[in-house]
Regions:
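Helical hydrophobic small-molecule/effector-binding pocket
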Residues: 25, 46-78, 124-132, 161, ...
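Residue-level signature of the cytosolic catalytic core of signaling kinases
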Residues: 41-45, 61, 112, 144, ...
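Short amphipathic alpha-helical segment with a characteristic S/N-K-E followed by hydrophobic residues
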Residues: 15-20, 30, 82, 86
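Amphipathic alpha-helical linker/stalk segments
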Residues: 23-52, 98, 104
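Helix-turn-helix
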Residues: 1-18, 22
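Amphipathic alpha-helical packing segments from all-alpha helical-bundle domains
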Residues: 47, 59-62, 66-67, 71, ...
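Membrane-interface starts of transmembrane alpha-helices
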Residues: 112, 116-120
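C-terminal peripheral helix-coil segments that are non-catalytic and often amphipathic
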Residues: 51, 55, 96, 100-108, ...
């Protein structure tokens, strides 16, 4: 809720869609900044991937983000440019950020050589596991920290089995 009139809002945004995208961008930006910080932490690859994975799963499985994702998906029928913009700002940027980290780890010999973007997508898919779909379908409650830790530990284990040196 904004503490101002619609007129004031539309002085800044030309349409409801533009306002909606600005809100989405704001939420995506927080996760991107956290991921960048974790990727630049200079820690061990397993620990960095674990930290990024936990941050990501916590974010995408939270009640607020699940609700927003449902709204964005519903808007996609009416205005597909909104869902495309969301994908570019959210998941697309996340993959770019993680790809850059993975690429540098590959170049440093900490991960096996491969296609960094594909590896980043695979890592996020492993982190999503069943939980994101279950949350979107309201089949599960928001996960506890221990559940997130276990899911991400398994994702890192499987990822490192394929890309570890």
């Amino acid at each position: 809720r904004a503490n101002c009139s619609k007129g004031t809002l539309y002085n800044y945004f030309e349409s409801k869609d533009e306002l909606f995208l600005a809100c989405v961008a704001r939420h995506c930006e927080g996760l991107q900044l956290e991921m960048l910080s974790l990727a630049r932490s200079g820690g061990d690859v397993r620990q960095t991937l674990s930290d990024i994975g936990r941050s990501y799963v916590r974010f995408v499985s939270s009640h607020a983000i699940v609700r927003r994702f449902r709204m964005i998906a519903a808007e996609g029928e009416r205005a597909p440019e909104i869902t495309r913009a969301f994908y570019a700002m959210g998941p697309g940027r996340g993959v770019e950020t993680l790809s850059a980290y993975i690429r540098s780890a590959m170049e440093a010999g900490e991960l096996r050589q491969g296609e960094a973007t594909r590896a980043a997508r695979s890592f996020f898919s492993l982190c999503n596991g069943h939980r994101v779909k279950a949350r979107l379908c309201n089949a599960e409650a928001e996960p506890a920290v221990a559940e997130i830790d276990a899911d991400v530990a398994e994702a890192v284990r499987v990822f490192m089995a394929g890309y570890g040196t």
